[in-house]
C-alpha cells in the first residue's frame, strides 16, 4: 500500500498536460470543480498516482462534461454540489480505505447522456463477462445492450474523447438537436428514448423517437433489465448515480 502523500506528491504530474489537452481540444469541455478530500480518497483507494490521467482527474477535477455534457467523465467531485458523482461514489468505494477492495467488474469512469457506460477493465475481464484485455477500456452500448472492447487504456480514452472523433463513434445514436437536449440536462439526468434505442424502430428512424430527461439511474436500470430480458446476459454493474 502507498500512502496518500506518495500518490499526490509526484514528479511530472499529469494535470498540466491534461489541462492543456482540454484547452486545445476540438470539442467543448467543462471542467467541474474538484473536492480535495474526495479526490484524495479516490487516489488512495485506487492506488494510482497523480502522474496518471486517472489520478489527475480525481485530484484536480470534479469531472468533465464533454461535448456539451453528452459524455460525463468522473473525477473527484463532491456530488451533491454538481450533480455529478465522484469516482468513489459511482463505484461504491468503501467509506474507509480497504486494501482488499477492488471493483468487481471494472471501474466505471464515464457515462453518456443516453446510458452508455465507459468502464476500465480489471485484472480478469473474462471472469467478469467483459471483452478486452486487463486495463483496457470497454463501452456498454445502449443500442445493442452489449459491452464492446475499445482497445484503449484510460489515458488514451481521454485523449480520444477530446480529439473530435465522437461524431463518428456516436453515428446512429444522435439525432437532430441532440446537443441542445444534452446541454439542458441536469448532471444527474440522462435522456430516455422511446421506442428504446435497441428497438428496430429507433434503429430505423432515431429522429422520430420521443425523448425526455429522467434520472440517469432510470436510464441505466431500464437498459440493464432489457439486456436480461433479451437474453444478452447480465450487464453487470453500470455505476451508482
Which residues are covered by each model-predicted region?
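Compact, glycine/acidic-enriched structural inserts
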Residues: 129-172
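Short aromatic loop motif centered on NTY/YTY
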Residues: 157-195
Amino acid at each position: 500500500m502507498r500512502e496518500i502523500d506518495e500518490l499526490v506528491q509526484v514528479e511530472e504530474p499529469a494535470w498540466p498536460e491534461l489541462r492543456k489537452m482540454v484547452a486545445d481540444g476540438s470539442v467543448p469541455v467543462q471542467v467541474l470543480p474538484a473536492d480535495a478530500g474526495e479526490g484524495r480518497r479516490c487516489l488512495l483507494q485506487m492506488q494510482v498516482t497523480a502522474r496518471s490521467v486517472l489520478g489527475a482527474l480525481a485530484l484536480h477535477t470534479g469531472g468533465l462534461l464533454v461535448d456539451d455534457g453528452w459524455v460525463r467523465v468522473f473525477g473527484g467531485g463532491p456530488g451533491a454540489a454538481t450533480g455529478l458523482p465522484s469516482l468513489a461514489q459511482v463505484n461504491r468505494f468503501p467509506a474507509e480505505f480497504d486494501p482488499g477492495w477492488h471493483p468487481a467488474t471494472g471501474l466505471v469512469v464515464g457515462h453518456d447522456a443516453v446510458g452508455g457506460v465507459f468502464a476500465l477493465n480489471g485484472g480478469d475481464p473474462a471472469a467478469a463477462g467483459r471483452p478486452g484485455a486487463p486495463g483496457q477500456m470497454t463501452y456498454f452500448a445502449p443500442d445493442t445492450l452489449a459491452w464492446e472492447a475499445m482497445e484503449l487504456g484510460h489515458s488514451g480514452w481521454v485523449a480520444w474523447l477530446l480529439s473530435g472523433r465522437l461524431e463518428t463513434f456516436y453515428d446512429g445514436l444522435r439525432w437532430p438537436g441532440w446537443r441542445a437536449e444534452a446541454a439542458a440536462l441536469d448532471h444527474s439526468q440522462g435522456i430516455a428514448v422511446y421506442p428504446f434505442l435497441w428497438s428496430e424502430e429507433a434503429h430505423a428512424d432515431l429522429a422520430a423517437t420521443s425523448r425526455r430527461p429522467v434520472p440517469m439511474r432510470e436510464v441505466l436500470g431500464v437498459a440493464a433489465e432489457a439486456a436480461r430480458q433479451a437474453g444478452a446476459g447480465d450487464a453487470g454493474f453500470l455505476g451508482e448515480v
